[in-house]
Amino acid sequence: MRADRQSTAKLRPSLHAVIQTGNLNAFNFTVEGVDCPTPADLSRYCVANGWFFKIGNQVIIPVLRNFPAFNYNTDIGRFTSFPFETLEDVTKLHDLANGDLVPHFAFVEDGSPVVAAICDRHDNVVTLRFRDSGGRIITVEELLAGEQRDLNLYQGLDQLADEAGIRPEDIDQAALAAQAVADAGGGVAQQQAAAAAAGVQAQEDLPVGREDELRPEDVADARGQAAAPPQAQAPAPPDAALQRQREQAILRQVPNLHVLPQPRQQLIDRLAQVREAEQKFINEMIQEVGVIEQQRDVAAAGMRLELCRSVHRVDGILRAYQERVNPFRLGLNYRPPILLEEEIRVEENARRLGGEIGLHDFEIAERPERALLHAEYLGNLMHVEQEKLLTTGRTFVAHIHQAGYCNPEGWCCLQDVEVQVQGIEPESLLPALAVRTNCRGLVLRAPLPIIRVLTQIIHHPSGLDRLEATLNVLLTDMRERVSTLTTADSTRRIRVNDAHDLAAMTAPLGHVYAMLSRWRDNVARLRASAQHQLIAQELARKYAEWRPGQHYTIPGRVLNLFANRQLRYQSQLEWVYPHLWIADRNLAGAWILNGVVPTYRNLGEWVPDIAFIGLVQFLEFWEEFVTWFPHYGVGPINRGVPVFPTVFSPRMSSLAVRLL
């Protein structure tokens, strides 16, 4: 491929510079655009030279078993490459190579010159940084062989052992098994063990000098006494071939790395017993219900009420055991304050199913504490969510200050962008776009909190159909008091006759509801792909001061800021957007007191309640806007003209829904 050849042409001189000079700093460089090497390109050189590099959160490298630490005089072009992308690919290579490849940690012997290439690939930009490292190589084979090592010396070793299912006790068992094979060989191993035991005993009997110091002459005498182990007549060794077969047979026995701890295994066994008892109980209930359906009398109605109560109690027991086995099973639907009143819910549902009394009358006449419990819980929840919004907003402002997007004095990095108009009058307003406000949704699914849905929309965008359906369902759950910012519980559902009745929501949730309604209406505008270029121009007018014939001069540091510090990876945008809309609705859209349209040029004049929070829309748009210039990725943009996309990608569609 052309990109591969160009990246190789730029990468090879830097590699030779390291080989010829021996200076690790000679390899500091940045490749952009089509010249950017892929992780597979980097692995071709890392495998050949014994380098390790980072992909995601894994610091790994496949290394030849007989490969030296580092060789400056080797021609890198003659090595066979094994490109890989993830840790799973390395494992597959290890299996296919029949043990010739050994994935290991990035630690080498002291004094060996080794470089670490960290791949920060983002938007076709790779930055390679190198440093010296020291330590001792530890491979998977050594780990399974059970050699005694100080595991604290190797960073990340415990994490890898946990992910691979390797336990220290299993390693000890493997070591004992290997020792058993050696012991089966006869008296030679016993003689070696006796010599080792004598050495240990001699070390324990070493004389101790004053102030916990040993005298050299005492140590020499003790070592001389321990150097002569008792002579023992070694019996004839067994057949060498038979002993080798025994050793190979035990080494092939892989330790059971998937045995659960005893307490957890007991819980799972108990859960299986509870499930079996529940199934037996359900079968008995089916028989009882059949008898009740045949009787049709008052006594049968009472039996039906008791059956409802029993079923709810058994369900609670089963849920309690499942919760102990997997604490995250209930997820965000787990409500301790409400579950404390489980008996109230059981009684309520039983009476409602029995047809004795309505829910509203039951709460008022029999158990008013049920309604009070809901009111107290929702009131406390509102304060917690508002505090979270404020905290996240302050964190976002601190981040954009620290990252260099702006400063407290009202300066913004976008103010350094120069805009030149080439004497062309701005065209008239864009044509009106058709907006559909139909409400289509999905059914038969568990409710979700608002923040969880926003996280999916911002970080994992999908098609417009799924986005619109998700927003419609979420809006319905908000109207019916099921979903809040952080919770979702279908037992709180209330029936709302009017789709525009927002009385059941608090004021902050009402503002968030308006934001999601706006997003749903914007989805309809994006359905016609022929309008995408016009929508891109509309967004550029609003957030980038674009006009026909406009030229932009964007410094390289601004481009690097947008390329390497994207907000969706640095901040909790799912909390920032609700905060922005609540502040905007409280200010009635007046971000500047004198009525001037707010832009990044007049950031210092914004109202303090929304200052810097509103920059999230400008910064998110500019992250995409700078990629529309033809020369993006090869240096600063000098008097460039954007080329607007004709069809949006899913991520750009999700961004346009939020910004329109």
From Swiss-Prot:
It comes from the Viruses. Residues 222-239 have a biased composition (Low complexity). Residues 220-239 are annotated as: Disordered. This is Uncharacterized protein VP8.
